[in-house]
Curated annotation (Swiss-Prot):
Residues 400-464, 504-523, 551-585, 602-675, 737-790, 803-850, 943-968, 1041-1131, 1257-1293, 1305-1344, 1360-1414 are annotated as: Disordered. The lineage of its organism: Eukaryota, Metazoa, Chordata, Craniata, Vertebrata. Residues 849-887, 971-1004, 1243-1303 form a coiled coil. It comes from Danio rerio (Zebrafish). Belongs to the CAMSAP1 family. The keyword Coiled coil applies. The gene is camsap1b. GO terms for cellular component: cytoplasm; microtubule. Signal peptide: none annotated. Keywords: Coiled coil, Cytoplasm, Cytoskeleton, Microtubule. Residues 400-417, 440-450, 504-516, 643-658, 1106-1115 have a biased composition (Polar residues). Residues 1317-1328 have a biased composition (Basic residues). This is Calmodulin-regulated spectrin-associated protein 1-B. It is found in: Cytoplasm, Cytoskeleton. Its main location: cytoplasm. It holds the Pfam family CAMSAP_CH.
Length: 1558
């Protein structure tokens, strides 16, 4: 549809077309400008046109095709046969006969008869000097080409007049544009052509802008319900946003001012051609630039020539150079070509002429249908059929908005059945319908579904709209890496930024490309990807019409297009349908029709969509995405959104970004692992992917699936449909696998999926059954982790299964450890489970079906749905923030008091937790509160609720240390509140000792900083930690506190820095020193998940501020299975530091006081295993190894940042009053605590010192700048004062000079002798000679230059240099006050004299100053005259008429009448109209400078003269009594006379050199 695609697209298309032309051997060779002979070109062009019209373009005799020949001296001559034809007038008669009608043709016997026939039509054959061409001129020998060329020009003009007229142009323009009849009506044919071309170009500009805006409306308008607006773009890399939207400018449509000069690049004419023939001339094939190069112009001209040769009967009679250089002599040739264009497009109108304005009208009707006008009743089949465009109908431009005009040109495609009506299911159809309706209901499915599939195999019912991105994990199980076109390594859809599982959508296996889909369907010759620079960034463009009911959006992906052989550069977005031949193009490009929606609540109003639906199949992405290979994974990594957008999706703590990035990822290099955040884009769409080919592995409605459903599936409620069943089964079998192999850290995506997410979904699935979207799906791993590494090439489902179940460790890539914060999913699914994968092993269904094409439209669906979610999230943002802040305080206090009061549970009471979460979900109408929690918290919650019946499985929940005690509460009584108090006292003592040591720290700073550098583990930056974590499977010695993957809207971590409060998408504490001096045992299978949870995180820069990390080394207790050696216990209680009892709930190893301001701020979850035993070990306590020490977190933050490579100045940011945001309890090694605190204090003092130094330097710099400004102000004031004094003196000089000249003028008028000036100037000269030096010296030297400049600006062309350098006696011949000669003429006040003399000097080039000459004693010249700028020029005109124009006795009667009229006229400014450059007087005009109108007073000429009519301007020189041409284009009050263009005069008799006016 969008023939007006973006400017970049036009250039791309033009470039690619140019490349194709050159590749085809059509590289153009042109004559350089310096070798171009315009006279020869004029002869050749005229003869070419003449022969074409006389003989017919295809029947020109061979010897006449080239009218020139070269003689033996290499001189070019016209061939004798051509000369004979011209002399015989045969050609002229033939061509003239084409124009004349009836009897007149018979009279054409000679040159004279042709001349007379033309003159009868008002066209006179005139030579350049306005002498008429006669018969003898045309027949004389040797041939006189200077007469034959005007003859052919006159014929061309007559031909032009026949084809185009002002009336025709106006009537045609009226059809598609508006104009002001009083101002814009053309006054001649040339103006009419400019008018027509400009209006067409304006119309095209309007069309492209409208299309661009409507596209933007789809993408950005918040009122558009399904548009992926702000939130969608926030997930998109900046690179894509720049390419995609407002950064790209529209094509430049040029407005002509001069016909010949402005059409020479071909762009304007090609735009006209495109407007009338959009099917034949694509807009993106035209090079539309504001400044076109010669190559671009040549390309355009060549395109124009080819079009004219192919479709317009070879009517382009010029060469490429002729139009490129466009010499003025070829004006008639260009005009006749434009006239032919007009004639073809507006008069003849062949069938290929289909102007865009007609289609725009159709579009307007389609677009005008409101999106909200949804029928409330089902639509009949007849109505469905009526929506379809008949194949024979004219293909309309498909609107961006919803339109009933469906691209129903897919009859030949095997992927689409023409019998499937393109309408959605009826309302509330929950089960598979009979064959004719079940599958046919999906617009998207129809364009993707193979007819061979059973109709009943819809993958889910209409009731449940599942996220389009969350396809079955087996959809592309058998695709190999080779299916992903490696040339398009960046071809992953931008949806990867939105849905972590969308990689599958970017691969269409080769075996799935149907014969009818061999190439991308170019709608109107442009693929749907044209708005993306596919050559550089193989982005998946996701723009199409939204269907209001299903958000069905058509899109393609670049990999498909690449594979299918379409040159990316040639693609443009939104083409129109080409014709029936495009029927067989790729089905995923079919734009969807406007469809009635099934009535269901808006998603914004019910935002708690069942998470089973939202995410259940998202976990299957491992296989789906894996087929795309590491390359796709890398590109999906590249597409990660920036960190600051974290609030719209869930951070994930698993190290998803650690995939090896392909070198191809040039556009977006992921941050260093230390700053990397594993983004979890929200999967908030709920779109129904296509049905039949969805997942050949199983069908929800098939009997096999039904039979294999486990009884225990969480599908109890009637509203829970088959989808939930399958999702539950998949969860269960994934978790079973995890139980079997808990140590696989690099499992594929399914295993990595957080068990917490499944728990969450099942808890919430019944309460938000009807679902809106949810905010996030944190458990789902990103695409990156799903593609373990580039080395893994999954080629079949069987291999995947083998690799999953077999413990082949070689599968796992060390860089892609899909580590989960939840070590094991066993607790999430406590019921007896049957492995769905095992069942699938027995399933006979083939796995190599055509499943990928469906993803095309679904991906854009996701964008649209994400926009819905974004709006819902934003609309409740404030409410949620208030609520979460309140809840944070409440829960923080409750949890803290619960701990202090020695509660019997290790977390919040179970009813409190579950009720709170359920209530919160309901209260917010969305699932942020639950779904966005980190795995650890949710699993902990589920663990508590199921501990009684699943004590064994609970062991895996916090397998941080290894073995788990069978009873979670068996050690509660051992910790006494007194011990806690004693710990507090120890903490206070430690703080006191720290204060005492502060004086020593300045001496120790150097040493300590060196130690920091030398200790590799303590100074390890988050980058290093991440690298270690991802490459080493060993268990870290300290438990890190995991930031839940919650939406930060709900869960804001305490801010230690106000500078970057929101850059925390994935917040996992990494202890900077936690591995120092530690040994960690090799993890056992039970350790491994915990290791995953520790290693998986990223610590971005902001995290190192917001989540203060201090991992303290404690004595290691190696119990059964590799315990953690140290513990980090952060209690981030916003209210206050409080006493914490030393009961298990406060000292258990896995305590998770999450560092966020969210629901579970103080919820603590513990590992029941040996870590607890370690901590409560009396030996430990007695040795003081695990003593509780209170340290202000903000103190530690400084050191943390010092030690990290991020090097953020926490003290600069955090000391602004936010230090108090958190206090923490740490179990520290007492012996080493002082050293560590000393290091921290040293770093803190060092920073403070550095800051003070910087502040001092800044202050000095500011003072220096202010002093400099004061000096500058003083200097300027002094300069101003001096300038004013000089100006005053200058004005005095001007006044004196003026008075002297006035006196001279009066004397001259009275014709009195001037005795005084003779003697006076001599005296003055003597005085001034004496005073010359002193008068110039005190003044600065710059005034002379300034005065020269002023003089030049005032219009004077006097040579100031000559004036300034003349001898003192001549320079200073001025009046009494003149001390410097140049000062007189250079003052603005004297510009009257100087400018007048300047204009006088244009002709003779005199540089003598008139001021100097008039001021000389001997001066007796003509009288001075006044500048007419502010006064009347009547005296000048009077003088001119009397002494120049109408001088002499013969003209006296006319002169007297003219002068009388002149006296009567009240106008101040008058102008004389001359016939031509001979200055024959024709009329007198009055000029009104305000309106710039010129109206006739008396004489012969047009009533008024417009700007376009003026040819030359003249100035009258009173002293020389003659007119001089002014080298100017604009009329002003200094103009005294003018001429108009020759063609505006109509001669009464051709013979007379002077014609009477109209």
């Amino acid at each position: 549809m969008e023939d007006g695609g973006l400017g970049m697209d036009a250039e791309l298309g033009a470039d690619s077309a140019r490349r194709k032309m050159e590749a085809a051997g059509e590289a153009l060779e042109i004559v350089p400008l310096e070798m171009y002979d315009s006279a020869r070109a004029k002869i050749a062009a005229n003869l070419r046109w003449l022969f074409a019209k006389a003989f017919g373009i295809d029947h020109i005799p061979e010897d006449l095709r080239d009218p020139f020949y070269r003689d033996q001296y290499e001189q070019e001559h016209i061939k004798p046969p051509v000369i004979r034809l011209l002399l015989s007038c045969e050609l002229y008669c033939r061509v003239c006969a084409l124009i004349l009608k009836g009897d007149q043709v018979a009279s054409l016997q000679s040159h004279q008869s042709v001349i007379q026939a033309l003159s009868r039509k008002g066209i006179y054959v005139m030579e350049d000097d306005d002498t008429p061409v006669t018969d003898s001129d045309l027949t004389c020998q040797p041939i006189k080409m200077s007469s034959h060329i005007p003859m052919i020009d006159a014929l061309m003009m007559a031909y032009t007049v026949e084809m185009i007229s002002i009336e025709k142009v106006v009537s045609c323009v009226k059809r598609f544009s508006t104009f002001s009849a009083s101002k814009e009506l053309p006054f001649d044919l040339e103006d009419a052509m400019i008018f027509w071309i400009n209006k067409v170009n304006l119309k095209m500009r309007e069309i492209t802008e409208k299309e661009h805006k409507s596209k933007q409306h789809l993408l950005e308008s918040p009122s558009h319900q399904k548009s992926p607006s702000k939130w969608y773009w926030k997930l998109v890399p900046v690179r894509y946003r720049r390419d995609h939207a407002s950064g790209r400018q529209l094509p430049y449509f040029q407005m002509l001012e001069d016909l010949i000069r402005d059409v020479c690049d071909g762009a304007a004419l090609l735009t006209v051609v495109h407007y009338y023939c959009p099917e034949l001339m694509k807009l993106d094939d035209i090079c539309l630039k504001e400044v076109t190069s010669i190559a671009d112009s040549l390309y355009n001209i060549q395109l124009l020539k080819e079009f004219a040769n192919e479709y317009l009967n070879k009517s382009f009679y010029l060469t490429l150079e002729d139009l490129l250089y466009a010499p003025p002599v070829l004006k008639h040739n260009v005009m006749v070509f434009i006239a032919e264009l007009f004639w073809w497009f507006e008069i003849v109108k062949p069938e290929f002429v289909q102007p865009r304005d007609v289609q725009e009208f159709k579009d307007a009707r389609a677009v005008s249908q409101p999106k909200s006008a949804r029928p409330t009743v089902p639509i009949s089949n007849a109505t469905k059929r009526s929506f379809l465009v008949s194949p024979g109908a004219a293909d309309p431009v498909l609107p961006v908005q919803n339109s009933p005009e469906v691209c129903n040109s897919n009859k030949g495609s095997s992927g689409f059945s023409p019998s499937h009506p393109l309408l959605p299911l009826r309302q509330r159809q929950k089960k598979a319908q009979p064959a004719e309706e079940s599958t046919a209901c999906r617009n998207r499915s129809n364009s993707l579904t193979q007819e061979g599939h059973p109709r009943g195999s819809v993958a889910w019912s209409d009731k449940r709209q599942r996220p389009l991105s969350q396809l079955n994990r087996y959809v592309l199980h058998s695709a190999t890496d080779s299916d992903a076109d490696l040339a398009s390594g960046d071809s992953v859809s931008l949806t990867c930024s939105i849905s972590e599982d969308s990689l599958a959508s970017t691969v269409t296996p080769k075996h799935q490309s149907h014969p009818g889909q061999g190439s991308v369907r170019r709608i109107n010759g442009h693929s749907l990807l044209g708005n993306v620079n596919m050559d550089e960034e193989e982005e998946l463009v996701a723009i199409a019409r939204a269907d209001p009911s299903k958000n069905d959006i058509t899109l393609t992906n670049s990999e498909d297009t690449e594979r299918q052989g379409v040159t990316p550069g040639a693609k443009s977005i939104w083409g129109r349908q080409e014709d029936a031949s495009s029927d067989s193009r790729t089905a995923s490009f079919f734009l969807e029709p406007l469809m009635p929606a099934v009535l269901r609540p808006a998603k914004e109003k019910s935002i708690s969509l069942n998470k089973e639906e939202e995410s259940g199949e998202g976990r299957q992405r491992g296989s789906t995405r894996r087929v795309a290979g590491a390359e796709s994974a890398a590109s999906s990594t590249r597409r990660r959104p920036p960190q600051t957008l974290n609030r719209t999706f869930t951070p994930n703590t698993s190290s998803e970004f650690e995939t090896t990035i392909e070198p191809k990822s040039s556009e977006f290099v992921p941050p260093a692992p230390g700053q990397m955040q594993a983004f979890r884009p929200l999967v908030t769409s709920s779109v129904e992917p296509s049905s039949a080919e969805r997942s050949p592995g199983f069908y929800l409605h098939s009997s096999v699936t039904e039979e294999k459903r486990p009884v225990q599936a969480w599908d109890a409620h009637p509203g829970t449909s088959d989808i939930e069943t399958v999702e539950t089964i998949e969860e269960q079998d994934a978790e079973l696998t995890k139980e079997l192999h808990p140590d696989k850290k690099q499992h594929f995506e399914e295993e990595v999926e957080s068990a917490k997410l499944r728990e969450d979904m099942n808890v919430k699935e019944h309460e938000d059954k009807d679902g809106g979207s949810r905010c996030s799906s944190p458990g789902q791993q990103s695409q990156v982790s799903s593609v373990a590494s580039g080395s893994i090439r999954m080629t079949s489902f069987a291999e995947r299964k083998m690799q999953r179940f077999g413990s082949n460790q070689d599968i796992r890539s060390s860089t892609s450890s899909s580590q989960r914060t939840t070590p094991d999913g066993s607790e999430s699914c406590p019921l007896p489970l049957t492995s769905w994968r095992m069942k699938r092993d027995q399933s006979p269904t083939p796995q190599n079906k055509d499943n990928a094409n469906m993803l095309a439209s679904e991906l854009v669906q996701l964008h649209m749905q994400l926009e819905e979610k974004r709006r819902a999230i934003e609309s409740q943002k404030k409410k949620m923030e208030i609520l979460t802040a309140r809840q944070r305080l409440k829960l923080g206090k409750a949890a803290f008091l619960h701990i202090v009061k020695k509660g019997k549970s290790d977390t919040l009471p179970q009813p409190t937790k579950s009720e709170f979460y359920l209530k919160e979900g309901q209260k917010l109408n969305e699932e942020k509160e639950v779904s966005s929690k980190d795995d650890t918290c949710v699993d902990a919650l589920r663990d508590r609720s199921k501990e009684a019946e699943e004590p064994e499985k609970a062991s895996c929940e916090w397998a941080g240390g290894g073995t788990v005690s069978s009873s979670p509460l068996d050690v509660e009584e051992e910790v006494d509140l007194n011990e806690c108090n004693r710990s507090i006292e120890l903490l206070n003592e430690a703080i006191g000792s720290i204060q005492q040591q502060m004086m020593q720290l300045s001496l120790q700073q150097e040493m300590l900083m060196k130690q920091n550098i030398q200790s590799p583990t303590s100074a390890t930056s988050p980058l290093a930690n991440d690298q270690i974590n991802t490459s080493e499977p060993r268990v870290r010695a300290s438990i890190h506190f995991v930031e839940p993957s919650g939406s930060p809207v709900v869960r804001k971590p305490p801010k230690l820095s106000s500078a970057r409060p929101r850059s925390k998408p994935s917040e996992l504490l990494l202890g900077k020193e936690h591995s120092k001096g530690q040994k960690s045992s090799t993890p056992t299978p039970t350790d491994s998940p915990s290791a995953r949870s520790i290693q998986g995180g990223r610590t971005p820069k902001a995290e190192s501020q917001d989540f203060v990390q201090s991992s303290v080394r404690s004595e290691s207790f190696n119990k059964d299975k590799g315990n953690h050696k140290g513990t980090t216990f952060h209690l981030n209680d916003e209210a206050n530091m409080r006493m914490v009892s030393r009961e298990p709930s406060s000292v258990a190893l896995g305590v998770t006081f999450e560092e966020s301001m969210s629901l579970r701020d103080t919820e603590t979850t513990f590992d029941d295993g040996t870590a607890r035993d370690n901590l409560i070990s009396s030996e430990d306590i007695s040795r003081g190894k695990a003593n509780l020490i209170e340290v202000d977190l903000s103190d530690l933050a400084a050191n943390t940042d010092d030690e990290s490579t991020n090097a953020l100045d926490v003290t600069a940011d955090g000391s602004d009053g936010e230090k108090k945001s958190g206090m923490g309890f740490f179990f520290k090694d007492e012996q080493k605590a002082e050293d560590e605190l000393a290091k921290k204090r040293a770093a803190f003092l060092l920073k403070q010192q550095r800051k003070a130094e910087e502040a001092r330097l800044r202050k000095q710099q500011l003072e220096a700048e202010s002093e400099q400004k004061r000096d500058e102000t003083r200097r300027k004031a002094e300069e101003e004062r001096i300038r004013k004094e000089e100006e005053k003196a200058r004005r005095e000089l001007i006044k004196q000079e003026y008075l002297r000249k006035k006196q001279l003028e009066l004397c001259e008028e009275q014709e009195q002798p001037q005795p005084k000036p003779k003697t006076k100037p001599k005296k003055q000269r003597l005085k001034s000679v004496v005073k010359e030096e002193p008068s110039i010296d005190p003044l600065p030297k710059c005034p002379a230059a300034n005065e020269n400049l002023i003089s030049a600006q005032s219009g004077s062309s006097l040579s100031l240099a000559s004036v300034a350098t003349t001898e003192p006696d001549s320079v200073n011949s001025g009046g009494a006050g003149s001390q410097r000669g140049e000062s007189v003429e250079s003052f603005p006040g004297l510009s009257r004299n100087s400018s007048r003399t300047t204009e006088r000097d244009w002709d003779n080039g005199s540089t003598a100053s008139s001021i100097t000459s008039t001021s000389m004693a001997e001066y007796t010249g003509p009288k001075l005259f006044k500048e007419p700028s502010a006064k009347s020029n009547k005296p000048i005109i009077h003088n001119a008429i009397s002494h120049c124009c109408l001088a002499g006795k013969v003209n006296e009667p006319q002169k007297n009448s003219i002068l009388e009229e002149l006296e009567r006229c009240e106008s101040n400014h008058l102008m004389i109209l001359f016939r031509d450059s001979g200055c024959q007087f024709r009329a007198l005009y009055s000029y009104f400078p305000d309106t710039e109108e010129i109206h006739k007073l008396t004489g012969t000429g047009p009533k008024s003269i417009t700007k376009k009519m003026i040819d030359k301007l003249y100035k009258y020189s009173s002293d020389r009594k003659q007119f001089t041409v002014i080298p100017a284009k604009t009329v002003s009050v200094s103009v005294d006379a003018l001429t108009i263009h020759n063609h505006l005069w109509q001669a009464k008799r051709p013979a007379g050199p002077k014609k009477s006016a109209k």
